[in-house]
Each structure stands twice: as structure tokens, then as C-alpha cells.
């Protein structure tokens, strides 16, 4: 992960926004987008009560997960140029099989660093859903780029920023696969990794539509009636609009 001046991938909406690789200087402001959008509005965050004001420890746990994830150097953000604000983010993680006998990244983080029951439940959801399809083994791949957290500030919604971040996550991953300039932002110890796909857990109708529009293949669907936390099923907290999550993949 570079310190500053991340790669400019595109300008958007007649030059009103720019999309860049996330660097250390962008990280804390990017985490605020999670605080002000993702943790409040994302379906599984609601199911795990991470959206409730008193669950600050859960949000801190997941921001630490995002800080570590960002160190890979494959995360992206969108900046609104007139205000200078970061308004949308994609926290992306290079995922690969750990050495024999070691835990995967999510399992290791869950076991060693998570303190909040709400964050533990969200991590358990992610781990369980990822485990339903062994993407690396089943599709004969050594590495994928996981689009872990995708978020846009509500006041900048419906401008296609999430879709564009998803498209450029694919483009960035393809550039790394081909040994291109995106490698310059990747952590040095990961520069031998070559993602052969982008995968994601789409958790709302909005992200289902993004995945469909961009061309992701749905590998598995799980209704929210199958998950519980603190005496309630996820669907009871999420509401009727978003009924299930999807594990999806875009093969490069």
C-alpha cells in the first residue's frame, strides 16, 4: 500500500468525481464512509445489530479488519472533487489458501482480534458463506480478489458509484493478473499473487443488481431466514426488501 497519490483510474459523472487506488493517506477518511453508510445500512450489519448506536466496539472491530485489508493495496475509493470528500469505497482483499495447518485470513482475524459479539456474528456469516463454495479449489485458482465491503454515502447514492467501483475492482484485478502498473500499490509481500477472479457476498437487492449488471456469476444464494443473532432471525431486522445474500464470482 502506497503512502499517498494512489493511481487515478477514472473520472466520473462529467468530471465531478475521481476514482483512485486507496493509499495510507486516504484510509481514515475511507473508514468514515463505513461508519456513515455501511455499518448503518448494510443488510448483515442490521442483522447483527452493528447499526445500533451502542455497538461501537463492533464497528471498531470491523474498521480494524478494513485497515488490515487495505494494506494489501487493492482497495479503491471515489472522491467528490468539489467538496474534496471521499464518498464511496471498495475495501478489497487478496485471498489465497493459507499454508497447511493455518487458518484463512477471516478465521484468523475473527479468532484473534474480534471482541464484539455483533462483529463475531458478522464474521461467522462471512466465513460460513465463503465456505459453502470453495472458490479456489472448485475453480482451480490460487488467488482471488474479494470485494469485501462496498459502501456509498447516502447523499451520493443512485449515481452508479458502487457499480463503477465494482467495475474497477475487476479492472484492477485483471491488471494485477497481467503484471501491470496496479502492482505498484500492492504490498510487496503479495506481489507474486495473481487474482484469477473477483468474488463478493452481495447482501441487498442493490448489490444483487450491481453484480448482475457487471456480469458476476451467482454461485450460491442463502435466505436471511437461515441466520440468527440475539434472539432474532436476520430477516426480522433487515425487513422484506432484501431477502437473501449471494456468493458471486467474476472470472477474469
Task: Label each residue range with its predicted role.
Residues 2-64, 69-132:
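Short amphipathic alpha-helix that is part of the acyltransferase structural core
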Residues 45, 85-157, 183-187, 220-243:
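Conserved acyl-donor/pantetheine-binding loop and adjacent beta-alpha core of acyl/acetyltransferases
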Residues 19-22, 30-32, 153, 160-165, ...:
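Ligand-binding pocket scaffold of soluble enzyme catalytic domains
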Residues 162-177, 192, 217-240:
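C-terminal/domain-terminus segments
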